[in-house]
Amino acid sequence: MVAAIYDWSGFYIGANGGWGSSHKCWDVTNFPRATVVPIFREGCHDATGGVVGGQIGYRWQSAGWVFGLEAQGDWADLNGSNVSGFIRNWTNNSKIEAFGLFTGQVGYAWNNVLWYVKGGAAVTDDKYRGTVTATGALFDSASETRWGGVVGTGLEFGFAPNWSVAVEYDHLFMGNHSRSFTSTGVLGAAVVPVGGVFRTDSIRQDVDLITARINYRFNWGGPVVGKY
């Protein structure tokens, strides 16, 4: 009797979707046009929501070991806010609109079941807003493309010769960045002109992601191996 050996080698493309949470802590360092000493903690919040996107990669298998490279890009809707601990009439808002992961993988396969770990670079598209707590009026804003690192792990199941599904967890280490916020003039253009720097904040960020994935592997020229 011949038992098929599942082959994880080859190029693959797929889709993913799930949930994310970005933990951000804000410290004001400049307000307005004056250095804040000591740095004043504005507080933290979790920006949560859904993610959906795709991935493309290549894997090669040696005995039970599986190695790979992958690029992933997702749209995101991770939103959160907190009332500032610096001035209570301010609310700090954040949103991640997209992210990308560029990783290497190492895993071990038990026939059509693959467990893997991954690590590499991460990038996020971040938007920040300051609003009046009572009215929601926008008084300043900032944005950035932030680079950091990612580690993750996943469990994948091959349910057909070229198809597999997986569940994956990733943690993004996005570090601490300083951002200057542009004034809208809502709190008084005489204090800070429209378009001027209203304040500067140091913002720390980490992101956690849980996604379900489906992949199609092309496996060009790779026949199914059998064993007796």
Language-model segments: residues:
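Gram-negative outer-membrane beta-barrel domains
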Residues: 1-228
